[in-house]
Swiss-Prot record:
Function: Major role in the synthesis of nucleoside triphosphates other than ATP. The ATP gamma phosphate is transferred to the NDP beta phosphate via a ping-pong mechanism, using a phosphorylated active-site intermediate.
GO molecular function: ATP binding; metal ion binding; nucleoside diphosphate kinase activity
Protein name stated in the entry: Nucleoside diphosphate kinase
EC number: 2.7.4.6
Keywords, alphabetical: ATP-binding, Cytoplasm, Kinase, Magnesium, Metal-binding, Nucleotide metabolism, Nucleotide-binding, Phosphoprotein, Transferase
Record GO biological process: CTP biosynthetic process; GTP biosynthetic process; UTP biosynthetic process
Required co-factors: Mg(2+)
NCBIfam families associated with the record: PRK00668.1
Primary enzyme class: transferase
Pfam family for this entry, one: NDK
Length: 140
């Protein structure tokens, strides 16, 4: 499998509970390498822009509220098949449906406060990385 890069976020529900290290360790233990990382407090405009694909969904307002309620760690992860590997270690969107040992099973509070984000395909990974990072901020 090819070496890929994907975009990941440790969401405010998790940073507020001081889980940045614990979640990053789970990503690293799964074979992913953090090649860029920064801590941001998203503006409403940034959150709405990032999640624009969901703007007509009923949970959009709540999603933007949650994402602007505290700091987020935005990261670029690199590794073999990184996009799928990250989705696997994250677990299902709703933690009630997440497999044992996944980040969302272990740490998420609810479908809205589900601790992590990960790109779902190569195209979205490229877009999402570009949304938060310049090329020089990524050090492989
Ligand atoms: N979300 C929510 N309620 C829902 C579906 C999604 O609050 O019914 C939030 C949740 O935080 C999720 C995000 O919207 O992580 C993006 O949804 P998506 O379906 O893309 O899930 P993901 O890719 O994050 O698993």
């Amino acid at each position: 499998m090819a070496i890929e890069r994907t975009f990941s976020m440790i969401k405010p529900d998790a940073t507020k509970r001081n889980l940045t290290g614990a979640i990053t360790k789970m990503l690293e233990d799964a074979g992913l390498r953090v090649v860029a990382s920064k801590r941001v407090w998203m503006s409403r405009r940034e959150a709405e822009g990032f999640y624009a694909v969901h703007k007509d969904r009923p949970f959009f307002g709540e999603l933007v509220e949650g994402m602007t309620s505290g700091p987020t760690i935005v990261q670029v992860l690199e590794g073999e098949g990184a996009i799928l590997k990250n989705r696997e270690i994250m677990g299902a969107t709703n933690p009630a449906n997440a497999d044992e040992g996944t980040i969302r099973k272990v740490h998420a509070l609810s479908i809205g406060e589900n601790s992590v984000h990960g790109s779902d395909a190569p195209e979205t990974a490229a877009q999402e990385i570009k949304y938060w990072f310049s090329d020089t901020e990524i050090v492989g």
